[in-house]
């Protein structure tokens, strides 16, 4: 089995893959590992992998072109891998999913601090979020706890406001999943950016984002709706979506 990672910090993974249980399994030939640098598939002087989101807002988004080129190049080197993209909006990454991936090569797209344009998952065979899996000595979960505790600290991020409306944040979005975000190009492989995000009308952009956040939360994490801070109108809209989803599941 071949495990691959695609990120802007490939040096992070080699120590993990060479230590403890993973290290022994790798030495025994149970799996092979490669870490790719996403910047190797950029074509500008600064090796840029991210850009500002359409519609404005804090933070940056990883661009789709370098990722698409990287996946195509990696696939050409050997068996086409299942691409695993970790996101709050996706199939729960359970132990069952992890075991299923053992049957094929897997390439994990790691976004680090920068988020990924919504255009990217449209090309992915698999999307998943971190959830119930078995980890040796819980190192991975401890790392995750350190990240979530220290990320809000002043100076940890280039723009401190970029953490405000993230998924699960209780500051601005009321505990909803984050709305879909897009960055350049405006169209990629026939998939375009929602026109409202390039309209320049900030009020309409804010309204679209709020509605989209509710829709995404209803689809992927309906359990969050009960505790989310919603207006009566928003809660009624969410209930319509949930009722429709329940009716479809019953058919």
For the regions a language model picked out, list residue spans one by one.
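A short aromatic-anchored loop/beta-hairpin motif
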Residues: 43-46, 50, 54-68
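Long, charged alpha-helical interface segments
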Residues: 172-228
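Glycine-rich, flexible N-terminal cofactor/catalytic loop recognition
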Residues: 2-40
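Hydrophobic/aromatic beta-strand patches that form the interior of the parallel beta-sheet core
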Residues: 4-6, 34-36, 84, 107-108, ...
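S-adenosyl-L-methionine/SAH cofactor-binding core of RNA-modifying enzymes
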Residues: 61-113, 118, 155
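Active-site glycine-centered loops adjacent to acidic/histidine catalytic or metal-binding residues
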Residues: 9, 112, 133
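Structured adenosyl-cofactor binding patch, chiefly the S-adenosyl-L-methionine
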Residues: 117, 121-159, 163-165, 170-171, ...
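N-terminus-biased detector of the onset of the functional/mature region
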Residues: 211, 215-251
């Amino acid at each position: 089995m071949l495990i691959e990672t695609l990120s802007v910090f490939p040096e992070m993974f080699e120590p993990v893959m060479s230590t403890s249980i993973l290290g022994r399994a790798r030495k025994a030939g149970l799996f092979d590992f490669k870490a790719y640098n996403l910047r190797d598939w950029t074509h500008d002087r600064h090796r840029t992998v991210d850009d500002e989101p359409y519609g404005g807002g804090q933070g940056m988004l990883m661009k789709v072109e370098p990722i698409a080129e990287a996946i195509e190049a990696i696939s050409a080197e050997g068996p086409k891998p299942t691409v695993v993209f970790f996101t709050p909006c996706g199939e729960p990454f359970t132990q069952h999913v992890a075991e299923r991936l053992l049957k094929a090569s897997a390439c994990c797209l790691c976004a680090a601090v920068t988020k990924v344009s919504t255009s990217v998952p449209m090309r992915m065979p698999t999307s998943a979020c971190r959830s119930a899996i078995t980890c040796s000595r819980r190192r991975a979960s401890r790392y995750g706890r350190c990240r979530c505790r220290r990320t809000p600290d002043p100076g940890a991020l280039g723009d401190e406001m970029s953490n405000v409306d993230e998924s699960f944040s209780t500051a601005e979005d009321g505990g909803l999943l984050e709305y879909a975000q897009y960055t350049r190009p405006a169209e990629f492989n026939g998939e375009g950016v929602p026109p409202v995000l390039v309209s320049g009308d900030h009020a309409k952009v804010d309204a679209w984002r709020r509605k989209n956040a509710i829709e995404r939360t209803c689809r992927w994490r309906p359990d969050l709706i009960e505790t989310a801070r919603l207006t009566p109108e928003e809660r009624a809209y969410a209930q319509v979506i949930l009722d429709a989803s329940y009716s479809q599941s019953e058919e």
